[in-house]
């Protein structure tokens, strides 16, 4: 029973951190400001997280778990190459749109001036997603007997760059320019180009 309040407090701290990232774009979040937002002392924050870097790691763990587990579901449920790519990109964009504060972590904006390992973890997450896209594209040859004229690694990088660009626009516009805006039309164009290659 004693564990539950601690878990809830940790979650509450992370939710407040994400909320502050959303409502204070471009501003650095200090532990003093976060403690005030949570309604506890800085010492109480440090009872749950030994450092601010660990708080950001908690958000990154949430991001990794949310995205990678859903990508695995897409891989299991959908077999069509283009539909898989579409769903992975759509997942990234919808996730960022529904979690504006966390999109600043995805974009790296919230991690400026923070511990290098945090930026490294986000880079690793995007590398995993790019690898997943590359695998999806390579499986097209195995499944359909026809590949692409361009290397799958180059195409996977292009697809991920598209999603990262949309997330960057979202952050830069202070969450006004939605990442999913015009996605259906853009995807139709991208898909057409991919199928031509």
UniProtKB/Swiss-Prot annotation:
DNA-binding region (UniProt annotation): 30-49
Keyword entries, A-Z: Cell cycle, Cell division, Cytoplasm, DNA-binding
Pfam families linked: SlmA-like_C (PF22276), TetR_N (PF00440)
GO BP terms: cell division; negative regulation of division septum assembly; regulation of DNA-templated transcription
Localization annotation: Cytoplasm, Nucleoid
InterPro entries recorded: Homeodomain-like_sf, HTH-type_Tx_Regulator, HTH_TetR, NO_SlmA, SlmA-like_C, Tet_transcr_reg_TetR-rel_C_sf
Molecular functions per Gene Ontology: DNA-binding transcription factor activity; transcription cis-regulatory region binding
GO CC terms of this entry: bacterial nucleoid; cytoplasm
Domain HTH tetR-type: 7-67
Predominant place of localization: cytoplasm
Family statement: Belongs to the nucleoid occlusion factor SlmA family.
PANTHER family: ACREF/ENVCD OPERON REPRESSOR-RELATED, ACREF_ENVCD OPERON REPRESSOR-RELATED
Assembly information from the UniProt record: Homodimer. Interacts with FtsZ.
Summary of the function given for this chain in its UniProt record: Required for nucleoid occlusion (NO) phenomenon, which prevents Z-ring formation and cell division over the nucleoid. Acts as a DNA-associated cell division inhibitor that binds simultaneously chromosomal DNA and FtsZ, and disrupts the assembly of FtsZ polymers. SlmA-DNA-binding sequences (SBS) are dispersed on non-Ter regions of the chromosome, preventing FtsZ polymerization at these regions.
Protein known as: Nucleoid occlusion factor SlmA
Biological source species: Shewanella oneidensis (strain ATCC 700550 / JCM 31522 / CIP 106686 / LMG 19005 / NCIMB 14063 / MR-1)
Lineage: Bacteria, Pseudomonadati, Pseudomonadota, Gammaproteobacteria, Alteromonadales
């Amino acid at each position: 029973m004693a564990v539950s309040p601690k878990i809830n407090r940790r979650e509450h701290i992370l939710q407040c951190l994400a909320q502050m990232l959303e409502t204070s774009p471009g501003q650095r979040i200090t532990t003093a400001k976060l403690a005030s937002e949570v309604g506890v002392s800085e010492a109480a924050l440090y009872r749950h997280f030994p450092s601010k870097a660990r708080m950001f790691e908690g958000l990154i763990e949430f991001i990794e778990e949310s995205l990678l587990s859903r990508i695995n579901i897409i891989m299991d449920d959908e077999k069509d190459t283009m539909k898989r790519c579409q769903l992975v990109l759509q997942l990234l964009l919808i996730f960022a749109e529904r979690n504006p504060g966390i999109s600043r972590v995805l974009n790296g904006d919230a991690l400026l001036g923070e511990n290098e390992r945090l930026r490294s973890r986000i880079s690793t997450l995007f590398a995993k997603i790019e690898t997943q896209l590359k695998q999806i594209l390579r499986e097209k040859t195995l499944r359909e007997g026809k590949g692409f004229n361009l290397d799958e690694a180059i195409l996977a990088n292009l697809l991920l760059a598209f999603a990262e660009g949309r997330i960057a626009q979202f952050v830069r516009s202070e969450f006004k320019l939605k990442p999913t805006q015009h996605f259906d039309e853009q995807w139709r164009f991208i898909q057409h180009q991919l199928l031509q290659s």
